[in-house]
């Protein structure tokens, strides 16, 4: 008896999924992909450029856009109050949406573009050369560190956010080397501080 019940219930479950799937859609399925984010149009709302996706959909497929706006309209009607705009939009802006890094914000350049070179004494007659400010010219510090180490045949390391320490006294040569390698760094933006204590 127990085996008969489980078999019949198992057959019903399998039959239900097949029947419901056939009723909902025609096979083969035709999926509409967004021209902006390349996802199906149902998933565009989870991307950072929702406005661009909606504009593309409205321009290329106005009837699909109308279906989407009709589906979303009950949510918006509940958020509208008298004398105010839609509250739902404000709440959407406050909440973080999933999917991607979001919109990339441009960094504001408030730091003046200046490269400073200083000679710092170590032990006895040994010196290190400190180069600061290369990052303000959008120069990769790791690449610059490798270049200095290879050019001067010495050790070099990135120590701070915008600081490279080169083992040895290269204050005379380094100005010319920087201008050869990175022409965007002009002579006026390089300042030699001379010998500086730690």
From Swiss-Prot:
Residue positions where N-acetylalanine is found in the record: 2
Localization (cell): Cytoplasm
Superkingdom of the organism of origin: Eukaryota
A single cellular component GO annotation: cytoplasm
GO biological process per UniProt: formation of translation preinitiation complex; IRES-dependent viral translational initiation; ribosome disassembly
Disordered: region residues: 72-109
MF annotations from Gene Ontology: translation initiation factor activity
Residue span(s) of domain SUI1: 115-182
Phosphoserine modifications at: 20, 73, 189
InterPro entries (alphabetical): DENR/SUI1_TIF, DENR_C, DENR_eukaryotes, DENR_N, SUI1, SUI1_dom_sf
Pfam families, sorted: DENR_N (PF21023), SUI1 (PF01253)
Biased segments, Basic residues type: 95-109
Keyword Chaperone attributed: no
Feature: compositional bias, Polar residues: 72-81
Assembly behavior: Interacts with MCTS1 (via PUA domain); the complex regulates translation reinitiation.
Function: Translation regulator forming a complex with MCTS1 to promote translation reinitiation. Translation reinitiation is the process where the small ribosomal subunit remains attached to the mRNA following termination of translation of a regulatory upstream ORF (uORF), and resume scanning on the same mRNA molecule to initiate translation of a downstream ORF, usually the main ORF (mORF). The MCTS1/DENR complex is pivotal to two linked mechanisms essential for translation reinitiation.
Similarity-based family: Belongs to the DENR family.
The protein, known as: Density-regulated protein
């Amino acid at each position: 008896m127990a085996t008969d019940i489980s078999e019949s219930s198992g057959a019903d479950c399998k039959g239900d999924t097949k029947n419901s799937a056939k009723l909902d859609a025609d096979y083969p399925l035709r999926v509409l992909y967004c021209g902006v984010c390349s996802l199906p149009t149902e998933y565009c709302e989870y991307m950072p450029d929702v406005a661009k996706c909606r504009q593309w959909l409205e321009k290329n497929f106005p009837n699909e856009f109308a279906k989407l706006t009709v589906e979303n309209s009950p949510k918006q009607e509940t958020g509208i109050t008298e004398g105010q705009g839609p509250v739902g939009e404000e709440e959407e802006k406050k909440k973080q949406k999933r999917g991607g890094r979001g919109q990339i914000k441009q960094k504001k350049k408030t730091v003046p573009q200046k490269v400073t070179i200083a000679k710092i004494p170590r032990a006895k007659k040994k010196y290190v050369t400190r180069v600061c400010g290369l990052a303000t010219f959008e120069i990769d510090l790791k690449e610059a560190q490798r270049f200095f180490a290879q050019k001067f045949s010495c050790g070099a390391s990135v120590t701070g956010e915008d600081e490279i320490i080169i083992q040895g006294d290269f204050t005379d040569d380094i100005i010319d080397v920087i201008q050869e390698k990175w022409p965007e760094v002009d002579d006026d933006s390089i300042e030699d501080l001379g010998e500086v204590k730690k």
